[in-house]
């Protein structure tokens, strides 16, 4: 019973992570927002199928953190996975 519960929780967390990581992070007007800046030129190819953004961490302002805004039908940390489950595909 305990193993079954743990498996369900892990599956839930994985699905939640995938959904959250594939959500667009642009503002309503298409702006990056105050804590998201364009990536430096050396990170131009960081995202496989999307746009790179430099996320300014509020708790560690000097630490660089890069994220991707994925193109349509792509998901993942660096937009490298084609989302075949997308109903618009």
From Swiss-Prot:
What is the name of the protein in this document? Answer: OMEGA-ectatommitoxin(02)-Rm1a
Which family does the entry's similarity section mention?
Answer: Belongs to the EGF domain peptide family.
- Entry's Gene Ontology cellular component terms: extracellular region
Q: Where is the signal peptide?
A: 1-30
Tissues and organs where the protein is expressed, per its UniProt entry: Expressed by the venom gland.
Q: Which organism is it from?
A: Rhytidoponera metallica
Residues covered by the EGF-like domain? 43-80
Briefly, what is this protein's role? Ant peptide with probable defensive activity which acts as a potent agonist of the mammalian epidermal growth factor receptor (EGFR). Mimics, both structurally and functionally, vertebrate epidermal growth factor (EGF) peptide hormones. In vivo, intraplantar injection in mice causes long-lasting (several days) hypersensitivity of the injected paw to both mechanical and thermal stimuli. Its long-lasting effect is unusual for venom toxins whose effects are usually immediate.
What keywords tag this UniProt record? Disulfide bond, EGF-like domain, Neurotoxin, Secreted, Signal, Toxin
From the record, give the cysteines joined by S-S bonds. Answer: 39-52, 47-68, 70-79
Localization: Secreted
* Gene Ontology terms for molecular function: toxin activity
């Amino acid at each position: 019973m305990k193993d079954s519960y743990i498996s369900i929780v892990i599956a839930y967390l994985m699905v939640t992570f995938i959904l959250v990581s594939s959500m667009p992070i642009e503002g309503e007007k298409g702006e990056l927002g105050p804590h998201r800046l364009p990536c430096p030129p050396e990170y131009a190819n960081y995202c496989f199928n999307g746009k790179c953004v430099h996320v300014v961490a509020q708790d560690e302002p000097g630490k660089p953190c890069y994220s991707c805004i994925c193109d349509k039908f792509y998901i993942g940390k660096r937009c490298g996975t084609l989302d075949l489950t997308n109903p618009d595909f």
